[in-house]
C-alpha cells in the first residue's frame, strides 16, 4: 500500500514539475508584424484661382463665396480613419498650393517623384495639357474634381486622368431630360459673352437635339446697365419674340445678368440653367441616400459652409481610393488602379452607384436638379433608358465618344 501511495505522489509531482517547466519555457518566436503601409493623397489647388473669387453684385454686395473643395477631401480622410488599423494602412492628405495654372504640372511631378501616386486636381482646364504631358506613363492617377470642360474628356483623353466632376454634357443632359419629362420642350436661350457661357450654351444645344427639345431662339445678352444696350441687357426685350416658349435657359457664368431674369420676362415662364433650377453634382438640400449625414459632417468641418459639387467630387475621389485599398486588401498602386478603373461600383450617396467609364474615364453619376432650397429631381429621369446603364444617358456614351481609352 505504501508503495502504491509513493508511486501516486511521484506521479503527481512529476506532472506538476512538467507543467511548471512548460510554463517557464520560452515562447516560440512570433512572426514580425507586417510593416505599416502608407497611401499618400495630394490635393492640388491654385491660389487666386478666379473661380473661387467672391461673386459680387452691382453695388459690390457679396452674393456667393465659393471655396476650394479641400474640405470634401478632408472628410473622406476622416471617414477612412477607422480602417487604418484594419488595413494596417495610413491614409494621408497633403495640400499643395501653386500660384498659376502653369505651376500645376511641375508641382505634381515633384510630388510624384517623392512617392505620391494619387492626386486631386482643383484647377481650370488650361492647366491640364501640360499636366497630362508631364505625367504620361507615370504610376499616378489624377482626379479632376472641379473642371466641367467637355474638351478634357473628348480631346485630352489621358489614361492617367479620372474625371470625377461631371462634364458639361452630363449636366446639360440631366437638365434637358427633366425639361422634356415635364413637356417643356420649347426653349428660349439667353447666352452670355464669356467662353464659359458659350461652352454651356453649346452643351445645352447638343442636349436639346439629343433628347428632342427645340430651341426657339438663342439671344445673346450683354451685361451692364448702359441704356444704349437696352435690347441686349433687358430680359423683357430679349424675351419679346414672336414665338412662344416654355422655359428660359440662361448661360451666365458670371452670375450677373441672370439675377434680373426671373419675374422680368414678357411671359411668366420658369428660368433654368445658371439660376433657379440648376443641374449640379451635389446640393446641400439633398435628403436621400445618406446625404444628410454627409452634409452634416461637411458643414461641421467647414464651419457651416454648404457642400457643393466640387466638394462632393473631392470626397468621392478619396472614397474611391480608400475603397480600392479595402476591397483589394492591398496598398499596391497597380491593384488599386485596376480596381478603380474596373467594372466596380462606389456609393456616392446619390442613389445610383458611381463608376468609371472605360472609354473616357468620366465617372458615371446622377445629376441633381436643384432649386435654391430644394432638389426637385435627379437624372437620369425615369423613362430615359440605356441598354446597359441608365447613367450612360448622361454625357458622352461610348458610340458617340471621341475618346476611346479602352481600345
Language-model regions: role of each:
Residues 2-9, 21-407:
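Extracytosolic ligand-binding ectodomains
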Residues 14-21:
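C-terminal segment of classical bacterial N-terminal signal peptides
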Amino acid at each position: 500500500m505504501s508503495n502504491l501511495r509513493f508511486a501516486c505522489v511521484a506521479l503527481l509531482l512529476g506532472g506538476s514539475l512538467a507543467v511548471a517547466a512548460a510554463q517557464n519555457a520560452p515562447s516560440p518566436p512570433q512572426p514580425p508584424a507586417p510593416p505599416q503601409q502608407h497611401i499618400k493623397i495630394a490635393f492640388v489647388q491654385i491660389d487666386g484661382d478666379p473661380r473661387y473669387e467672391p461673386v459680387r453684385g452691382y453695388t459690390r454686395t457679396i452674393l456667393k463665396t465659393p471655396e476650394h473643395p479641400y474640405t470634401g477631401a478632408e472628410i473622406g480622410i476622416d471617414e477612412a480613419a477607422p480602417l487604418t488599423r484594419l488595413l494596417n494602412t495610413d491614409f494621408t492628405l497633403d495640400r499643395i498650393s501653386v500660384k498659376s495654372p502653369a505651376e500645376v504640372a511641375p508641382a505634381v511631378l515633384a510630388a510624384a517623384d517623392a512617392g505620391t501616386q494619387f492626386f486631386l486636381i482643383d484647377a481650370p482646364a488650361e492647366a491640364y495639357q501640360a499636366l497630362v504631358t508631364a505625367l504620361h506613363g507615370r504610376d499616378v492617377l489624377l482626379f479632376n474634381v472641379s473642371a466641367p470642360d467637355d474638351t478634357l474628356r473628348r480631346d485630352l483623353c489621358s489614361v492617367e486622368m479620372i474625371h470625377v466632376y461631371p462634364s458639361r454634357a452630363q449636366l446639360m443632359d440631366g437638365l434637358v431630360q427633366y425639361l422634356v419629362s415635364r413637356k417643356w420642350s420649347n426653349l428660349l436661350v439667353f447666352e452670355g459673352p464669356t467662353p464659359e457661357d458659350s461652352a454651356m450654351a453649346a452643351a445645352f444645344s447638343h442636349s436639346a437635339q439629343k433628347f428632342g427639345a427645340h430651341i426657339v431662339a438663342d439671344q445673346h445678352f450683354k451685361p451692364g446697365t448702359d441704356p444704349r444696350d437696352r435690347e441686349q441687357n433687358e430680359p423683357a426685350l430679349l424675351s419679346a419674340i414672336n414665338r412662344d416658349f416654355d422655359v428660359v435657359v440662361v448661360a451666365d457664368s458670371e452670375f450677373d445678368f441672370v439675377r434680373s431674369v426671373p419675374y422680368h420676362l414678357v411671359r411668366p415662364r420658369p428660368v433654368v440653367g445658371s439660376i433657379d433650377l440648376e443641374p449640379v453634382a451635389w446640393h446641400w438640400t439633398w435628403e436621400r441616400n445618406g446625404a444628410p449625414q454627409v452634409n452634416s459632417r461637411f458643414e461641421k468641418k467647414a464651419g457651416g459652409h454648404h457642400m457643393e459639387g466640387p466638394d462632393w467630387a473631392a470626397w468621392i475621389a478619396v472614397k474611391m481610393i480608400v475603397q480600392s485599398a479595402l476591397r483589394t486588401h492591398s496598398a499596391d498602386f497597380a491593384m488599386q488602379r485596376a480596381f478603380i478603373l474596373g467594372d466596380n461600383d462606389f456609393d456616392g450617396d446619390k442613389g445610383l452607384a458611381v463608376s468609371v467609364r472605360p472609354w473616357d474615364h468620366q465617372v458615371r453619376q446622377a445629376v441633381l436638379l436643384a432649386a435654391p432650397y430644394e432638389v426637385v429631381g435627379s437624372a437620369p429621369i425615369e423613362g430615359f433608358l440605356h441598354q446597359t446603364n441608365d447613367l450612360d444617358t448622361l454625357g458622352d456614351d461610348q458610340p458617340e465618344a471621341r475618346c476611346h481609352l479602352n481600345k
